[in-house]
Amino acid sequence: MREGMTVYIPPQATLARVRTKKLMYMAVFLIILSVLLWIGSFWALYGRQTIAPALSYVALLVLSFVTDRAGYSVLPINSTILTGWLCMTLVVMISSVLQSEPVRRQTRGMTYIMGGGITGLALGLLGFTFLTDLSALYACMILATVAGIFLGFLLYTNTPDGRPIRPGSGNFFRYLLAKGFPTAITLMQLGVALVLVIALYNINGI
């Protein structure tokens, strides 16, 4: 190419590059926003438990708008998934509002409950090592999360602080539902995103 000559770039190519960059920046922004919302939902479980599932749902909703350079959704978070988890979120929020104020503000045992739930979620995601059906993977993640929350709370009731709500005290299941239900829904919505991410990674890796 001779010096001084200019290269003609068609307007369509320039517009395509600008659009691609915008999509990339928007995808990064939405992913960061989604992560921050999930962090906020975990924080809310300790003091503002009523809004924790809502923050987790919004994080999942935001993630559904993430697209690749071609404009296609990165994760197949469809309207069926969003509608189902919206209903679950509304149910758990209403049940939390119906709890007495002292119970809603109580943080007793939340470290054990959340620790058990996160551990169960992580173990449930390991179902990819022996399961291939997506529905079975969802079920594995959900059951493992519920089991983790239950075992975490059961472990807490064996500590000196947890003895007043130990099994047989009359408060065990009531407190477990009051704290475990919002925690489960909050973690499971994160689990839905992680299941889809791992499933796509496995498909692309074949």
Predicted regions and their residues:
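Small-residue-enriched transmembrane helix starts and helix-helix packing motifs
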Residues: P11, L15-A44, G116-A122
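Structural signature of hydrophobic alpha-helical transmembrane segments
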Residues: M24-I31, P76-L90, A139-M141
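Transmembrane alpha-helix interface/packing and boundary motifs in multi-pass membrane proteins
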Residues: V35-Y57, F65-T67, A122-L134
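C-terminal ends of transmembrane helices
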Residues: L37-L45, M93-R105, T157-N158
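Selective recognition of hydrophobic, aromatic-rich stretches within alpha-helical transmembrane segments
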Residues: Q49-S56, W85, L131-L155
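Individual transmembrane alpha-helices with interfacial aromatic-anchor signatures
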Residues: G168-I185
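Juxtamembrane boundary at the C-terminal end of a transmembrane helix
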Residues: G191-I206
